[in-house]
Amino acid sequence: MMPELQWPLSDSQRKEPRPLRRLDQGLRDHGFLRLEVPDFDWHRLHLVFTGSRQFFTQSMAEKRRFGYQSASENFGYQGVSEEALNPASGQFDAKEAFTMRNIRQRSGPLESWPSAEFQRLMIAFYEQCFELMASITSSIAVIAGLPEDYFQSRLSGENVTLRLLRYPAATSSSAEADQVLAGEHTDYGLLTFLFQDGAPGLEVQDREGVWQLVPAVANRVVVNVGDLMQRWTNDAYPSTLHRVRQQGNAVDRYSVAFFADPNSNVEVTPWPTFVTAEKPARYQTILSGEHIQAKLEASHRPLLSAGLE
């Protein structure tokens, strides 16, 4: 079962031993946990879901005006079968997405955005998630024996990405009753926050290789470890396989993901706290940007080969 803990945004409460210990244990044991964050503006999340529904229910021609241009830019609309999170499977994902990388840099020109109101809302929610990200990453730095501000310069927003997602409702076809809507994968960066609207679908692979359904609990954020965090912690925090599978939902499934991915020039090598004589460093130093870009390009390579991007 996925652990759940209450996460205070205030510095004084967060730095107490118990929240730090539970955060560390949850990330070690599962690579996934669910947070209750009393100070989080859940009403704004409701507005984000409303904006997401309004965008995705527009005509395809209107959505295509804001089309995804390239994996390097990582911004814009993608339709069904335009991404393969598990490229080795040869299957495209049955989802739509509106991806917003580095929103801070795009806070000016409106041509990339459906409307000024949509832009303002997404920027506000992005900054809200950024605050939550800072509170968690500073705590992880303390756990790892690093300066509390270790991530401040490494997570300025260059690769930090907000993503709106829509998965289609089930049809009467039995072949689609348990269809995989987003292929099994691990996330690429440091941490991911996932917000769900109530329709289930996320499945996480446990240590025995069994897929476990994650309930869609209102006013909670699911946090999972990414590949770079696994490397930094020398496998102490696992980047766990997960996917989205059709659960017979009668309505479309909407979710919002926030990817806390480090700046491109950040070197990632196992932290000394997690390296011992019994457990030597398992990874060579890599650049964050090279890893993230390679993963993004792999998930879009079928499209590039077909000349669709």
Please provide the spans of the model-predicted regions.
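Peripheral, non-catalytic segments flanking oxidoreductase cores
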Residues: 1-309
